[in-house]
Amino acid sequence: MNSKAIISVFLIMLVVVSCTQATYETEDDDEPGPRHSEKRSCARGCGGDSDCPCPGWHCPSPGGRCEP
């Protein structure tokens, strides 16, 4: 095999693996509310309610994490 064939096989495998992981992350969403990945991005460190990007989330204490 030449180097172009090796590189293209590697890239195809990379795309397949990343698509498979994305499918698994969205399929296990059986609880109501934001998806798990959205919850991770909503639960960020905060210094006040204005630091929480998701609607309805608040900052319980400065230096804490946003909560629903």
Curated annotation (Swiss-Prot):
Residues 1-22 form the signal peptide. Disulfide bonds join 42-54, 46-59, 52-66. The keyword rRNA processing does not apply. Keywords: Cleavage on pair of basic residues, Disulfide bond, Knottin, Signal, Toxin. Residues 32-41 have a biased composition (Basic and acidic residues). It comes from the Eukaryota. Residues 24-50 are annotated as: Disordered. The keyword NAD does not apply. Residues 23-40 form a propeptide. Exists in two forms, due to cis-trans isomerization which probably occurs at Pro-68. Negative results: Does not inhibit human voltage-gated potassium channels Kv1.1/KCNA1, Kv1.2/KCNA2, Kv1.3/KCNA3, Kv1.5/KCNA5 and Kv11.1/KCNH2/ERG1, human voltage-gated sodium channels Nav1.4/SCN4A and Nav1.5/SCN5A, mammalian calcium-activated potassium channel mKCa1.1/KCNMA1/BK, and hKCa3.1/KCNN4/IK/SK4, human TRPV1/TRPA1 and human hydrogen voltage-gated channel Hv1/HVCN1. The presence of a 'disulfide through disulfide knot' structurally defines this protein as a knottin. Stable protein with probable toxin activity. Does not show activity on all channels tested. Shows no hemolytic activity on rat erythrocytes. This is U-actitoxin-Avt1. It comes from Aulactinia veratra. The lineage of its organism: Eukaryota, Metazoa, Cnidaria, Anthozoa, Hexacorallia.
